[in-house]
Amino acid sequence: MNDSGEVRSTGSVFFDAVHYMLHQCNKSSHPFLRYLSRIHRFHHLYFTRHLKFDKKYIQQNRFQALPLELVLQIIGTVLGYIFARLVAPKGVFWVTRNHLWITIIFQILRTTFVILSSGRDTNHTTYQTPPEDTNWLFVGPEFHSLHHIYPDRYMGSFVKAFDWIWGTAYTFKGKRIAITGGNGAFGQAIVKKLDREERGSCIRKLKFGTDWDHHHFEKALPVLSNSDILILAHGSKGADAVESNCNAAIRLIKLFKEHRVANPACPTLPEVWYVGSEIELHPAWGNKELQRNSRSKRMFLPQARSFFDDPDIIYRHIVPSAFHSPMGAAALSADWAAKCAIWWIRRGARYIPVTYTGIAWLNYFKFMYRIPYAKDMDQM
């Protein structure tokens, strides 16, 4: 990244912080802050949470909201310039006033063009459902459209640093959740954590033997069809490990994709969270139960890799270190594992290392670059 890009990136973080404050100031005791918040609200009234343009607010957006945004961008850029000058090593990254002026001129020209284009730009695209955002660093229309659906989240304007820091790259608001293994150690912990994150959220447990088994899933369909997130937290180290950890998981995901009904309160892609294990990478050390568990988890990996790149769902692969549960003792609790997983998800992660050993970090490279895509996805 060149020096002007460094100024813009740093300035973006300052702008995003002010942007976040605008969304918090609509009920401020200070009239001026409420006034600024109201002006910015015109932008959201113009490009609505349904990702449509409302022409009724076109003039307020062009001549009030966009000029305010430009002023705040310039202030953020100046602050970013000051910060970059303070931290940039002399002789390595020179950040000069020329870089500052280049960035400001670019912002003025860009905003002028957007105003002349009736307030439309590449970050404001009409979607029925926002597609999956595959860029981990820079903000594009996929990410920014989520901000218009959930105005208090997804604050990034150029880079996603603010959302990483504050955990605003995700929300559970309005999402219906189904979970298998909800009575297990991790399942109970994640349900408890989700209840705290979003009080009143709809979390339904799919019970093994009642709602589904390894070969029968019909009773699970009503829940699957009315869910936005499917969490697969069940697991087995017994003789049925492959059926449970691999084959049944694949079947549940495919049924979820096939039968899920769109939720007007949550116009985003459906999500699948699969709870894997660091045993995907490290050896099983001769224990028969661990060998069965390792084999079943590794058999699922090609399917997981295919789901990870599936444009129709957001697939999150959770890779925890061993945690204390009825399946075995460990140093840390399931509550810690659940809290760590949610911390990562709040920051938009899709590969989620829940680790105190570091193995899950190494497993990331295996998962992304060594695991082949499944060849039999349509035959399962």
Which positions does each model-derived feature cover?
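Membrane-embedded catalytic scaffold of the fatty acid hydroxylase/desaturase
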Residues: V7-G174
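N-terminal Rossmann NAD(P)H-binding glycine-rich loop of SDR-like oxidoreductase domains
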Residues: I177-R196
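Structural signature of the Rossmann-like NAD(P)-dependent dehydrogenase/reductase core
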Residues: T180, I231-A233, T268-S277, I314-V319
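Short-chain dehydrogenase/reductase
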Residues: T180, V242-C246, K288-P302, A330-D335
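Conserved mid-core alpha-helix of short-chain dehydrogenase/reductase
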Residues: H215, E243, N247-E258
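NAD(P)H-binding glycine-rich loop region in Rossmannoid oxidoreductase-like domains
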Residues: F217-N247
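Catalytic loop of short-chain dehydrogenase/reductase
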Residues: K254-K257, V261-D312, H324-S325
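C-terminal helical subdomain
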Residues: H317-I318, S325-Q379
